[in-house]
Amino acid sequence: MTGIWDVRITDTSLRDGSHHKRHQFIKEEVGAIVAALDAAGVPVIEVTHGDGLGGSSFNYGFSKTSEQELIKLAAQTAKEAKIAFLMLPGVGTKEDIKEAQDNGGSICRIATHCTEADVSIQHLGLARELGLETVGFLMMAHTIAPEKLAAQARIMADAGCQCVYVVDSAGALVLDGVADRVAALVAELGEDAQVGFHGHENLGLGVANSVEAVRAGAKQIDGSVRRFGAGAGNAPVEALIGVFDKIGVKTGIDFFDIADAAEDVVRPAMPAECLLDRNALIMGYSGVYSSFLKHAVRQSERYGVPAHQLLHRAGQRKLIGGQEDQLIDIALEIKREQESGQVASRR
């Protein structure tokens, strides 16, 4: 930490927001957003395909512009901010990490399901060997108990991870659920690694949960300007800064500048506002990975079944990131029920 901030903010609008934009960012948008966030004092800006390095694919959706080109542009544009990139083992490769560093990325964020931290070991090791700052993401953190999450965090820290995040991928955690998990990681990791929190707005608690995380000891917090992220979006950075200013938590980000960036630069690049609607609420309530939203809407249109029912059943099946294709099976199941006159259950 430096004297500039008590908590370091990472803006994920150019990565998590890629889900909302169906990975269709163009260089002009990325350059303008990076410049505005950098000028406002945002210390870390994450840039990649929504599903991380190598995510551009038939399964996840193809990028309009190469993520490596966007990382390079972001690094060339930012005067002070560091450029982070996300990587999911099994989606991206070690070579992708090296290329991202060559293009100016300096923070490598490795994401795994919350029970599978062991698959990150070699990638975290490589990142440290390359001299990159390392962050670990334990996704779908609501699905396991705090002590089990802490044990997974220990695996990442021992592999060289410098900050392990409690990642509320579904926006399903509620206040104490965040505080308990962050506190468990802080107790387990001590001085070995920092703890971070990444929230979503699917139950409308992105900002409140982030405050709980900081009070429990988190030193890094994610958000997206204008909630530009998957599902109902992430905690809006401009609101986070306003709240943190009010409670005396230093971030180094100027509230008025980030509010201007959200309104004047980021919003025009968004296809629509990220909404807390029925689909998003169902994801938070049922514990569904936030990036499932656009996939569910697509299958809803294709098969003529309600997206919210698809999402609810995805939660019942406890699907995780990477299992988006199972939404097709669920859609066909609901379609058969409709044709036979069955009424879909809400429970």
From Swiss-Prot:
The record marks R15 as: Transition state stabilizer. It catalyses: (S)-4-hydroxy-2-oxopentanoate = acetaldehyde + pyruvate. The active site is at H19. Keywords: Aromatic hydrocarbons catabolism, Lyase, Manganese, Metal-binding. Transmembrane segments: none annotated. The keyword RNA-binding does not apply. One of its GO terms (molecular function) is manganese ion binding. PROSITE patterns: PYR_CT (PS50991). Mn(2+) binds at D16, H198, H200. It is an enzyme of class 4 (lyase). One of its GO terms (biological process) is L-leucine biosynthetic process. SUPFAM superfamilies: Aldolase, post-HMGL domain-like. Gene3D superfamilies: 1.10.8.60, Aldolase class I. HAMAP family: HOA. This is 4-hydroxy-2-oxovalerate aldolase 2. It comes from Mycobacterium ulcerans (strain Agy99).
